[in-house]
């Protein structure tokens, strides 16, 4: 039986570091919001069977997304943190029967709207049948410094360091189990939750273009990348 690939986009955050008057996933770049650009990537990819967006219960922008993408499921059951939002989304996918425990969930940051299609394909091909799952990531290229106040305390050896990206792909049952803990403090991505179970996900080569819109100046680079598509 074919294993489904389901994209899950947690979009309940407020994007405080971005400094806009609305959550950063709803900031417009060109004629579309960041979230609409992101959803388009998954809706155009033939390897993705279903896309779900999980937003805050108080979200007032999601109706536009639903209008633009009527086939996308938009659920207003987001939590206070990313981990809670993903947990709620996975639980509902399983409860509604839209996902079986053996189906793949690809969790992707709403603010990574420049994900190249070939990177998504690579993740599905290399991690889609791996029981331990896998994530897109790129080797750390810059020299890293450990800080002590405002001074350098040490240079960090970067040989084995990778920078995590998204999507992060895991079986629905595994992800549900990994996020079942009552206290999700310190869980900054899905891989870190899975690692706490003693499982070591695959590292799949990501792409430098798959950057996350975090600071206001990132919008300039994102705009250039989107214009180049």
Curated annotation (Swiss-Prot):
According to UniProt, the reaction catalysed is:
2-C-methyl-D-erythritol 4-phosphate + CTP + H(+) = 4-CDP-2-C-methyl-D-erythritol + diphosphate
Note the Pfam families from the entry: IspD
Q: Does the keyword Nucleotidyltransferase apply?
A: yes
Keyword set, alphabetical order: Isoprene biosynthesis, Nucleotidyltransferase, Transferase
GO biological process: any one?
A: isopentenyl diphosphate biosynthetic process, methylerythritol 4-phosphate pathway
- For the protein in the UniProt heading, the enzyme class is transferase
Q: What is this protein called?
A: 2-C-methyl-D-erythritol 4-phosphate cytidylyltransferase
Q: Which organism is it from?
A: Neisseria meningitidis serogroup C / serotype 2a (strain ATCC 700532 / DSM 15464 / FAM18)
């Amino acid at each position: 039986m074919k294993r489904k690939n389901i994209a899950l986009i947690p979009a309940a955050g407020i994007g405080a570091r971005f400094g806009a008057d609305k959550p950063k996933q709803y900031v417009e770049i060109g004629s579309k919001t960041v979230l609409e650009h992101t959803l388009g990537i998954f809706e155009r990819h033939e390897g993705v069977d279903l896309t779900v967006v999980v937003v805050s219960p108080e979200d007032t922008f999601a109706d536009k997304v639903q209008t633009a993408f009527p086939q996308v499921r938009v659920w207003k059951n987001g939590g206070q943190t990313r981990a809670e939002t993903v947990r709620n989304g996975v639980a509902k996918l399983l409860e509604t029967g839209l996902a079986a425990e053996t189906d793949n969930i690809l969790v992707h940051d709403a603010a990574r709207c420049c994900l190249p299609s070939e990177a998504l394909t690579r993740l599905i091909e290399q991690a889609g049948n791996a029981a331990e799952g896998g994530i897109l990531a790129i080797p750390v290229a810059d020299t890293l410094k450990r800080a002590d106040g405002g001074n350098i305390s040490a240079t960090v050896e970067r040989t084995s360091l990778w920078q995590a990206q998204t999507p992060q792909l895991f079986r629905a049952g595994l992800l549900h189990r990994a996020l079942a803990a009552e206290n999700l403090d310190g869980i900054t991505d899905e891989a870190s939750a899975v690692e706490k179970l003693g499982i070591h996900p695959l590292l799949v080569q990501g792409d430098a273009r798959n950057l996350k819109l975090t600071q206001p100046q990132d919008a300039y680079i994102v705009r250039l990348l989107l214009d180049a598509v």
